[in-house]
Amino acid sequence: MRNKTLQDNTIVLGSCQDVAPLISGVDVVLTSPFYNTSTKSKIVPREKLGNANQRGRYDTIVDTYTREGYCDFMVDLFNKMHDGLQDNAVVLFNISYSTGNPDGYMFALSDIIRRTEYTLVDQIAWKKPVCIPDISTPNRLSRIVEPIYVFCKKGFEKTHYCNKPEISQGAASHRCYKPMYNFVEAMCGNKEKDEKKCPYNAATYSIELCVKLLRMYAPKNALVYDPFMGSGTTAVACKRMGLRWLGSEISENQVKWAEDRLKNAISPSIVEGKFDD
């Protein structure tokens, strides 16, 4: 049973390594961890750095682990989350690369599969409407697509949850399902109307992306955990859809920012993308 200090619909100020062992009954993990691709991250508030070339992505975490350290961090997190997830739960893991570190995250993914009780079952391409053009290299592409990796517990590859509609019934071997494609188009960052850009986090995904992913993988009244809650985007999407959420975040500034966003989040009764009754 979950530690009673962890209430639904809360964001805990603290490391995911400390919070993950306390979760239970989680249906979906939806997150975008730090990519470990920064070369200029500093433990100072981003808004206090006048020179854009000096700014790190985050106000607290230094995004420059060694390759081995980053792999160990992610393996440790997945292992600590294991008992708190439903057996049919999925982990939706948005992670990518940089020109300077194009393969580092591949080692982390490989170690998660080799060293934890999770395995990879799907990959989703997130197509952004725009991206920053790569004009500084002669042979690297501009990254307008980011991957989202879908993990489940080993042994549940055929039974993990997915909202894929059944279009014909019969014996299990003869059932047919409506196609659900591994390609999602969604805006990037907090660019919705009336939403301010978070000064403490320069690497956010969008509410639109979260809603589309949760409609694919979250059951009704699901409990969604984001170990890297950041500015609160996952929680805002959950509130809009009438889902429950838990989050962990080491930045006090971002926790306060997320809580303010949640106070103004739109009711699920007027949001396209909510679950039908």
Language-model regions, residue ranges each:
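Conserved phosphoryl-transfer catalytic core
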Residues: 50-60, 264-277
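Short, conserved SAM-binding/catalytic segment
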Residues: 1-7, 259-274
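Core catalytic lobe of class I
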Residues: 1-257
